[in-house]
Amino acid sequence: MRNSQDTMTIQSTPVGGQDPAQGSGESARDRLLDAGTRLFCRYGINATGVDAIVSEAGTAKTTLYKIFGSKEGLVEAVLEGEGRRWRDWFISSIDEGGPGPRPKLDRIFPVIKTWFADERFYGCPFINAVGEHDKNDDRMRTIAIGHKKIVLRHIEKLADQAGAADPAGLAHQIGLLIDGAIIAAMVTRDCAVADAAEIAARTLLDNHTRPVRKKAKPLMTA
């Protein structure tokens, strides 16, 4: 997902002390969300402690617990906000591809490539969160699936408008290409993996939207 904002100046707050930024323009909730987003995306959830979060946000620990209840509560709020921002960006960006559905579908991986090229790209927070949590804990998986369903629903709608024989199946296949490209780009730091995914996606689109030829009727014989 796209990271929220450029890194802000880290402020030091005494543990358990009063929030020094109370009354400032940006709420403590927003500062904690911004700090959580930056730190979780770059360093990982498990590697980021509460002390680092409140130091980055310039708040007290008690403020974090009062607003979010726990670090896990902050993690879930960060994922919700990041998912919403990323989906808004992704959908609006591919919809700029042209008036018809096919140009929009063709823009999926060029758009994804611009995300990969961003120096703040650290992979997908949802994939990362599921990977870091207990595999028997369904909370992160449920949040990740909810995000994925919204993305695939939009792709499926475009696929249906493009005349795909199986819009849901096509959307699922493109979704797998997106996930694979994200992981490959995160590991290799090579945004060109999006180009290979684009070639595969165009092949899928061509196959799914190719008109079905009707069999010619046999010629009448005398």
Where on the chain are the PLM-derived regions?
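N-terminal intrinsically disordered/low-complexity leader segments
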Residues: 1-27, 209-222
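Hydrophobic/aromatic-rich alpha-helical bundle segments in the mid-to-C-terminal region
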Residues: 2-3, 140-146, 160-222
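Short, structured helix-loop boundary elements
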Residues: 29-30, 50, 72, 76, ...
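Helix-turn-helix
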Residues: 31, 35-73, 77
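Hydrophobic alpha-helical connector segments
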Residues: 77, 91-118, 161, 167, ...
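Amphipathic alpha-helical packing segments from all-alpha helical-bundle domains
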Residues: 84-87, 93, 103-107, 136-161, ...
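Amphipathic alpha-helical segments used for helix-helix packing
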Residues: 104, 118-138
